[in-house]
């Protein structure tokens, strides 16, 4: 595990409390690490993966003392690792450690591979992410029902589940004055996942308000609560933090209060390789999993009711493929006998990030982060007619090219997705780009195109799940619109940094700096982006939840089509990208799916 680092910052009684280390509770010693302790046993439910959705669903199921659950997690309990995980200001320091899966993509643009960051440990990626807490546009979630046929997956329903997960703290007067916003009707207060303002106790930088004043002059809404269903605009954001500014990862929220339940067992240091099935008249029924660490050391464990895959958007598709569920062409190449033909591992949608950074003058000193969710017109500016023309003339061509590249399998069904995205951007005023600004002596924008038209894939390369041989191929920028959008968002960030009220605090650009001329065209920005982007690590849709006709892998209750007793319950199932950070969606989704599982359990009792 990462070594523990403890530090205490003493502030006056009047100051907001900065990060204080959390109480250290030895959870790991109460968990299982010996696979023989569970091998051959039978549980009601087996959950493959102890990340955000896995731990949330495990906690909800085991509220019923009659339900026995086993969670199998490759990593360990890491929430005690001190500031490197607990302190939100240490974001990024955990990258490259044993708590980071650090998957490699196949060679992409210019033959570059990219690292895909994902948490390895109980809590999954909530251990290592930026713990930002926003929600998407309501029309995006409504489309899951209206466009993709997933009954019950609409904003009104999901909004209640998302609020049910949350325990929000109202910002202080000083935080509101600095640029935070809070609409109490959009927040839950009785949930498990704490949210509040990030605050290190230092004075607030005036740059947040300067950004708001700059975009307000352009007609952009400011100080919007980003959790109310229409996030377009500029505001400061909430984070998953407790009152001591400690990261509230999924293990701290859902496992720490519940790890001593007698009906909940957590096995660490092991990975699920494949699902075990028996054939029935109704098709294959999941009866357990094979887990272990290598081909010579692995075990079987059995599920009375269901197997629930929660290994994440990069890994859950692989478990299905190792189990014989997937595209025949992929399984044949890996020497796996096909059990069921489903479009597993395609339709994967991740975003891309670039950075525009400048020095801040001494007048801009202080802490703070603000986000600009920009719509289509705000992002593209003078280039909006060109971008609109692409959306109105190229969807058929893009769908054909994507299918030919292996990003999807059906041109007609993919065009439904593309038309949905076009409607969002041109008719529904959804946020198209996110510009995330950090201060503290700088004006730093990390920014990304939120709505990618590129479709990637992740597939196995052998029949042995423990060799860890797979091809993660996001296919970044193989769609021209995605590159244009990322370039336009980058250009917008540079323009905003030195105009309007922001000019007072601008003290010279450091990135791109001299690497890109100041009056760069969108074409020049595109060239720069290709050389300097990174993945955004928000991949979804590799086991899409949509009608089977449109390319779905799971139905509206997260059940894998054509099977019994098998669900995928993680970030691989949302059928679309969204204009937000994804934790709120995943928590709400996990609670909704948990209710569906419990409904089926009640019917079987």
Swiss-Prot record:
Optimum pH is 4.5 to 6.5. Flavin-dependent enzyme which catalyzes the oxidation of beta-D-glucose by molecular oxygen to delta-gluconolactone and hydrogen peroxide. D-glucono-delta-lactone is sequentially hydrolyzed by lactonase to D-gluconic acid, and the resulting hydrogen peroxide is hydrolyzed by catalase to oxygen and water. Alpha-D-glucose, mannose and galactose are poor substrates for the enzyme. Glycosylation has no effet on the kinetics of glucose oxidation or the pH and temperature optima. It also does not increase the susceptibility of the enzyme to proteolytic degradation. However, it plays a role in pH and thermal stability. Homodimer. The overall structure can be divided into five distinct sequence regions: FAD-binding domain, extended FAD-binding domain, flavin attachment loop and intermediate region, FAD covering lid, and substrate-binding domain. Glycans are attached at residues 111, 183, 190, 335, 375, 410, 519. InterPro entries: FAD/NAD-bd_sf, Glucose_Oxidase_domain_2, GMC_OxRdtase, GMC_OxRdtase_N, GMC_OxRtase_C. Gene3D superfamilies: FAD/NAD(P)-binding domain, Glucose Oxidase, domain 2, Glucose Oxidase, domain 3. Residues 1-18 form the signal peptide. One of its GO terms (molecular function) is flavin adenine dinucleotide binding. It is an enzyme of class 1 (oxidoreductase). One of its GO terms (cellular component) is cytoplasm. Its EC number is 1.1.3.4. PANTHER family: GLUCOSE-METHANOL-CHOLINE GMC OXIDOREDUCTASE, GLUCOSE-METHANOL-CHOLINE OXIDOREDUCTASE N-TERMINAL DOMAIN-CONTAINING PROTEIN. Keywords: Cell wall, Cytoplasm, Disulfide bond, Extracellular matrix, FAD, Flavoprotein, Glycoprotein, Oxidoreductase, Secreted, Signal. Optimum temperature is 40 to 50 degrees Celsius. The active site is at 538 (proton acceptor). This is Glucose oxidase.
